[in-house]
Regions:
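Sec-dependent N-terminal signal peptides
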Residues: 4-14
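Sequence context of c-type cytochrome heme-c attachment sites
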Residues: 18-98, 104, 110-137, 157-171
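Cys/His-rich zinc-coordinating modules
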Residues: 141
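Short, exposed beta-strand-loop hairpins at the edges of beta-sheets
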Residues: 145-159
């Protein structure tokens, strides 16, 4: 009886570990290793060519200074209201802060899905933290967390999506 009770406790602890797994952010440079070629969909170079990759740097621009002045913000590069959209992972590390709106902002922390054998199996990658959107509406909902009337500007999802969309890698 004692052995079976111990086995139940060990199994319960192991199962709890599976469901309380925490993933860590690794930075977009790790994503670039695989996601830069035409074969893989060029996700990284596409991201580099968008305002997302420059969103934190934009907080140091004259335009940001004007927005900050209007909003009574001293330093937009340190203001939580600015950072929540311009550098959503800022509290994780200085590197992630500088990346602005990086791969992992939309696709989740890559520590456990970054390996090729995991990425080749979408279900396994999802189990390991990858966020994959199942529809354009789901993508739009994610975008609107920051782009809904940002700075008083309307958001044209269709036009904006054309600038950032990237192909899924070949399976």
């Amino acid at each position: 009886m004692k052995k079976s009770g111990l086995l139940v406790i060990v199994m319960a602890c192991a199962a709890a570990g599976l469901y309380s797994q925490t993933f860590t952010y690794i930075g977009s440079a790790k994503c670039a290793i695989c996601h830069k070629t035409e074969t893989q969909g060029r996700q990284y170079p596409i991201w580099q060519g968008t305002k997302h990759s420059q969103s934190f740097a934009a907080l140091s621009s004259p335009q940001a200074a004007e927005y900050a002045k209007q909003a009574n913000v001293q330093n937009p590069t340190e203001n939580p209201d600015c950072l929540k959209c311009h550098a959503p992972l800022c509290e994780k590390s200085a590197e992630l802060k500088a990346e602005g709106v990086s791969c992992e902002v939309c696709h989740g922390p890559g520590s456990d899905y970054k390996k090729l054998n995991v990425m080749k199996d979408v279900a396994l990658a999802k189990q390991n933290g990858l966020i994959v959107y199942d529809s354009q509406d789901a993508i739009k909902k994610q975008c609107l967390t920051c782009h809904a009337n940002a700075h008083g500007k309307s958001f044209d999802f269709a036009a904006s999506f054309e600038k950032i969309k990237h192909n899924k890698p070949a399976q």
